[in-house]
Amino acid sequence: MENIKHIVQFSGGKDSTCMLLMMLEKGMQVDDIIFCDTGMEFPQMYEHIAQVEQYISRYGKVVTTLKAEKSYEYMMFEHIKTKGKRQGQKGYGWGTMLARWCTAYLKTQVAKRHLRGQEYIDYIGIAYDEPKRHEGIAENVRHPLFDWHITEAQALSFCYEHGFTWGGLYQEFKRVSCWCCPFKSLDELRVLYHKYPALWEKLKDMDNRSWNQYRADYSVEQLEERFKQEVYIKKISIPLFNDQVS
């Protein structure tokens, strides 16, 4: 048992941040804190990671940042598939519900390689109000937040109380994942369009270069047209002056 490492899987989001802070405050064993950098995080997320590193230094801890050999964009546009029904195709394109290659290649496989040959217990930030994600966990996996009955809202509040704000990202997005994630809701994509124009232009360029469309129902250009129409409709719906006669 002495050789078993206790590994915190740290995404940088509210749940894994809360879990890490609580584990350290409770004096639990933490041997390694792993952050798998996809290279596609929001700028505020990288600032948050740096803030966390500064905070946990009081416990003598550091964040181990891991990266895949090839970048997200290389795999999306340049990698040649060597097997499967799309064998020989250049680039994986956008991830889909049936083929989330991005998560597998940039996170799961990277972490497994780092931990290969070690005996370890994985600590993952699954909140109490995510029971389906807690079901059927592996023998060497722990979900401390679930065990402590900490909900997602409570995890976020705990982080705020400790001074971690992500630059306001959680006021705009339910999930703070990669900024280009095709699984974002329409509301989140609307925020990206209106408040992050540089990232939106990058997203549009990536969609134009990809062999598959960003979403099944919309390309990024179609989303942009929709959001522009929404602004126009809202604008013409506002009366220019008060028509009521006093």
Feature map (PLM): residue ranges:
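Nucleotide-activated chemistry modules centered on ATP-dependent adenylation/adenylyltransferase
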Residues: 1-246
